[in-house]
């Protein structure tokens, strides 16, 4: 929509607002949750493969169910363990061992200041993280970043999402819930494919070059820069 003011920022979390060693994070996550979430008779390697397939089921979700439902439906079929049996085990993992994964992350002050300035200027903020996790896991990662859940008007979790990035449905679901148009929004993220796919809908993209995933040369039409450049950009934005 020509002339519409962009007053909303969608932010990715992992690798964007929360800098992290993605390989170390995923390894610790899959090993930890597999030990907690499958029965002892299943070998750890087989269990990790089951959890990975359940995650892929969420990534490929067609919108017919929530990501949470896609995850547990797949895991139940592969492991023979019901959701009712799995949930307490996974809750224990997120309440305990998951917290140690914080060691794979750190606080980026420029990212914290970026969010703070946007809030002060009146912009609406959405945490558009890949919705593969329950609320407790996502909320903990927000805290690890130096931010808090109240910084955001909306946060995507696996139980309130029916798609994953880069599906257009992921973005349109949030837009519809918040009565927004894509032309009102920026998308900030470090993934050249998943995050910048929002531009096809009308978002303005900012590809964060720190912790970049994908090939920067294949993305055109968006702003590109590191944390300090992003901070300078928002400092120069008008108040809403």
PLM features per residue range, with description:
Residues 26-34, 48-55, 72, 90-98, ...:
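Hydrophobic alpha-helical core bundles mediating ligand binding, dimerization, or RNAP-core interactions
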Residues 17-19, 57-58, 129-133, 160-161:
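Short histidine/acidic/glycine/proline-rich micro-motifs that form metal-
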Residues 52-95:
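A metal-dependent, Asp-based hydrolase signature
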Residues 1-9, 116-117, 130-132, 139-240:
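Asp-based, Mg2+/Mn2+-dependent phosphohydrolase catalytic module
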Residues 92-94, 102-104, 111-143:
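Substrate-recognition element of Asp-dependent hydrolases with the DxDx(T/V) motif
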Residues 22-25, 107, 137-138, 167-170:
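Residues at alpha-helix caps and immediate loop-helix transition turns in enzyme cores, especially N-
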Residues 2-50:
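Active-site neighborhood of HAD-like aspartate-dependent phosphohydrolases
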